[in-house]
């Protein structure tokens, strides 16, 4: 019985190693800031590669790590009373990189604008 227990323990330990390596896969940081004049009763719906990851409400932002590689970011407005079409932008995430976008309006359409912030501006936003 002890031999079985030891073998089982060794099996579990070796099985856990690939999971830990997969979880530690390097990626980048994606931040999407919702502009203040977006509309108090509107939500910016953010999708990454076709999957909804956030509904960004007034005063909030999306700030998460995403895997390295090419990703399609799509933003739309909810509720969509004006029948505006979602817009997309492609980002090539590199390990350790930070990618900041602003969700904002242009006419009747919401879009993501790449943002370049200075270190002082990033510190002010707590980034």
List each language-model region with its residue ranges.
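Short loop/turn and low-complexity linker motifs enriched in small/turn-promoting residues
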Residues: 20-127
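Bacterial N-terminal signal peptides
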Residues: 7-16
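Positively charged n-region of N-terminal signal peptides that target proteins for export
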Residues: 1-6
């Amino acid at each position: 019985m002890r031999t079985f227990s030891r073998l089982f323990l060794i099996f579990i330990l070796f099985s856990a190693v690939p999971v830990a390596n997969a979880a530690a896969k390097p990626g980048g940081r994606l931040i999407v800031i919702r502009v203040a004049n977006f509309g108090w009763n509107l939500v910016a719906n953010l999708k990454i590669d076709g999957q909804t990851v956030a509904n960004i409400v007034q005063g909030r932002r999306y700030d998460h790590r995403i895997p390295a590689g090419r990703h399609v970011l799509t933003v739309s407005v909810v509720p969509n009373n004006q029948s505006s079409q979602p817009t997309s932008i492609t980002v090539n995430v590199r390990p350790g990189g930070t990618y900041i976008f602003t969700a904002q309006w242009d006419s009747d359409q919401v879009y993501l604008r790449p943002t370049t912030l200075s270190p002082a501006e990033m510190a002010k936003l707590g980034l």
